[in-house]
């Protein structure tokens, strides 16, 4: 009778899924995330940041919102503040926002901080779920300042699953190999926000220059060129520029949990 190989040896031999892959799939983050982009009125970005620093984050926490990260673009002509929240569910998010908006403490803060005019001219909100290949999404920090990168990919019709497969099977590991820190991978929940064709993710770098060096090495890696060619034998997985891939480099605010 043949002896059975231990599961760990079978995994190493590629005969069964690896234990880490199985664990990551089993531990997929079930929370709902919200990516919000605020456009500050001219001359009001500092005031908006002060309101978040001194009041809003605490009120968000009071009403069950998890603050993950707050950033401003390195190049910020539109005076954007970008942040990421987490909730137990979409219903929980609705209730949290309802309770926050009705809180007398928030109403008082809003009135005082907008005595000389509104701080925000436009708000964009996208609800997200984590992909099954996303790392654990948490508000990590580092001893040295870091630069974040928000990347948005849009696919041709019917190609999102193939793009996910390429990230799951190849890109995530190659990013790690080339020193690209990975904060989280997401897909929008709503059709009008790109549920069928959009992948959104956040990377973490030592600097914008370090990001450029890492991506140069990544793109030159034979493992990447082979994976890209194989995955695109039936056509590209992202739309042509400038719509297919968008990148925004971000600096954490001084009050951001993730830095």
Which stretches of residues belong to each language-model region?
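Bacterial N-terminal signal peptides
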Residues: 7-18
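Short S/T/G/P-rich N-terminal loop/turn motif that feeds into the first structured element of a domain
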Residues: 19-226, 230-259
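Positively charged n-region of N-terminal signal peptides that target proteins for export
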Residues: 1-4
């Amino acid at each position: 009778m043949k002896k059975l190989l231990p599961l760990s040896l079978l995994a190493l031999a590629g005969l069964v899924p690896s234990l880490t892959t199985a664990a990551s799939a089993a531990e997929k983050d079930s929370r709902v995330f919200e990516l919000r982009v605020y456009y500050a009125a001219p001359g009001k970005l500092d005031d908006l940041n002060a309101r978040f620093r001194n009041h809003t984050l605490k009120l968000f926490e009071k009403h069950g919102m998890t603050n993950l990260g707050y950033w401003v673009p390195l190049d910020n002509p539109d005076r954007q503040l970008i942040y990421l929240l987490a909730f137990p569910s979409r219903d929980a998010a609705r209730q949290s926002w309802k309770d926050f908006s009705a809180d007398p403490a928030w109403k008082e803060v809003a009135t005082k901080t907008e005595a000389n005019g509104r701080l925000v001219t436009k708000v964009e909100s996208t609800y997200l779920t984590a992909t099954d290949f996303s790392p654990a999404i948490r508000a990590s920090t580092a001893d040295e300042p870091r630069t974040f990168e928000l990347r948005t990919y849009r696919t041709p019709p019917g190609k999102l699953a193939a793009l996910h497969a390429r990230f799951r099977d190849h890109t995530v590991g190659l990013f790690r190999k080339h020193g690209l820190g990975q904060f989280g991978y997401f897909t929008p929940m709503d059709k009008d926000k790109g549920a069928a064709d959009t992948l959104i993710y956040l990377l973490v770098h030592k600097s914008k220059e370090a990001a450029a060096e890492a991506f140069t090495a990544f793109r030159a890696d034979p493992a990447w060129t082979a994976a890209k060619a194989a995955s695109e034998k039936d056509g590209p997985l992202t739309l042509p520029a400038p719509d297919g891939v968008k990148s925004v480099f971000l600096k954490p605010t001084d009050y951001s949990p993730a830095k």
